[in-house]
């Protein structure tokens, strides 16, 4: 998975897909009542990037729908996976459930079109930066189930993004009954280098049949860092430069070991190859 980083403006969707991304990540900000309001990162952010792009969440979700709705003029066949980087650290722990409810309501209305019409092809990863906000997952799932559309949860996965100890992450999932559809991230801003020790631990847990199905690292922009991540057998690399990763994947060491995920690949099934 080539995961385009910090795609917070609608026009950037086309830009990152054109560079080779089959997945994009964006930042979701909440107001004091736990309503998701807009996509926005703010400063500081990654080196050599503009931090200030934003869209209102309703507009952004509608744009995501257009890009993953077969038959729509903007449909992008190779755009498969969306990572919702939730900025919930501004919220109290007690607001996590409500944040999950309200996020689900927005996605259901604006991306899934209230469960009506032709289904969209995108998959979602709900990425949470605080282990204490595990109830956000519960609020999200219960809201979708209450709308009578359990099948939509087949297209939703989860991630805790704060580089916590892997056993602590697993315990958080146990508290809300999550046993699959788990992506595990590991990383830091591209301005700072980070080793792959924890990422390799997550890969071992994935391959050992644990709750983790996929592992991705962020934010990786240099050729050698991408090679190192691929050598660690991660499933995805989040980058500001998808085109560089496209080039690396064509190298002799990787062209037969990896292929780009397509829209017929389930991003929540552990790859066995």
Curated annotation (Swiss-Prot):
Compartment(s) where it occurs, according to its Swiss-Prot or TrEMBL record? Secreted
Which GO cellular component terms are attached? extracellular region
A Gene Ontology biological process annotation? lipid catabolic process
Major location, coarse class? secreted
Q: Does the keyword Lyase apply?
A: yes
What InterPro entries has UniProt attached to this entry?
PLC-like_Pdiesterase_TIM-brl
Needs which cofactor? Mg(2+)
Q: Give the enzyme's main class according to its UniProt record, as a single word.
A: lyase
Q: List the disulfide bonds.
A: 45-51, 47-191
Positions annotated to bind Mg(2+): 25, 27, 85
Tissue specificity: Expressed by the venom gland.
List the catalytic activities from the record. Answer: an N-(acyl)-sphingosylphosphocholine = an N-(acyl)-sphingosyl-1,3-cyclic phosphate + choline; an N-(acyl)-sphingosylphosphoethanolamine = an N-(acyl)-sphingosyl-1,3-cyclic phosphate + ethanolamine; a 1-acyl-sn-glycero-3-phosphocholine = a 1-acyl-sn-glycero-2,3-cyclic phosphate + choline; a 1-acyl-sn-glycero-3-phosphoethanolamine = a 1-acyl-sn-glycero-2,3-cyclic phosphate + ethanolamine
Manner of cofactor binding, per the entry note: Binds 1 Mg(2+) ion per subunit.
Query: One Pfam family this chain carries?
Result: GDPD_2
What role does this protein play?
A: Dermonecrotic toxins cleave the phosphodiester linkage between the phosphate and headgroup of certain phospholipids (sphingolipid and lysolipid substrates), forming an alcohol (often choline) and a cyclic phosphate. This toxin acts on sphingomyelin (SM). It may also act on ceramide phosphoethanolamine (CPE), lysophosphatidylcholine (LPC) and lysophosphatidylethanolamine (LPE), but not on lysophosphatidylserine (LPS), and lysophosphatidylglycerol (LPG). It acts by transphosphatidylation, releasing exclusively cyclic phosphate products as second products.
Q: What is this protein called?
A: Dermonecrotic toxin LapSicTox-alphaII1
Please name the source species.
Answer: Loxosceles apachea
């Amino acid at each position: 998975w080539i995961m385009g980083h910090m795609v917070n403006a609608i026009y950037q969707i086309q830009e990152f897909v054109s560079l080779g991304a089959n997945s994009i990540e964006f930042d979701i900000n909440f107001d004091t009542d736990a309503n998701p309001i807009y996509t926005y990162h703010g400063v500081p952010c990654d080196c050599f990037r503009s931090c200030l792009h934003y869209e209102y969440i309703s507009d952004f979700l509608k744009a995501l729908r257009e890009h993953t709705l077969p038959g729509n003029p903007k449909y992008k066949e190779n755009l498969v996976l969306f990572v919702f980087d939730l900025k919930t650290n501004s919220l109290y722990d007690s607001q996590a459930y409500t944040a999950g409810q309200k996020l689900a309501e927005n996605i259901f209305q604006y991306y899934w079109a209230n469960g009506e019409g032709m289904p969209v092809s995108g998959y979602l990863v709900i990425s949470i930066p605080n282990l204490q906000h595990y109830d956000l997952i519960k609020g999200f799932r219960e809201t979708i189930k209450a709308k009578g559309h359990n099948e939509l949860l087949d297209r939703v996965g989860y991630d805790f993004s704060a580089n916590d100890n892997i056993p602590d992450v697993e315990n958080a999932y146990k508290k809300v009954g999550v046993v699959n559809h788990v992506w595990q991230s590991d990383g830091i801003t591209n301005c700072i280098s980070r080793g792959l020790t924890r990422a390799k631990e997550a890969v071992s847990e994935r391959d050992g049949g644990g709750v983790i199905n996929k592992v991705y690292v962020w934010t990786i922009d240099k050729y050698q860092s991408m090679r190192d991540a691929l050598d660690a057998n991660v499933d995805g690399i989040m980058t500001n430069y998808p085109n560089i990763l496209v080039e690396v994947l064509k190298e002799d060491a990787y062209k037969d070991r990896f292929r780009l995920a397509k829209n017929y690949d389930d991003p929540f099934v552990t790859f066995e190859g």
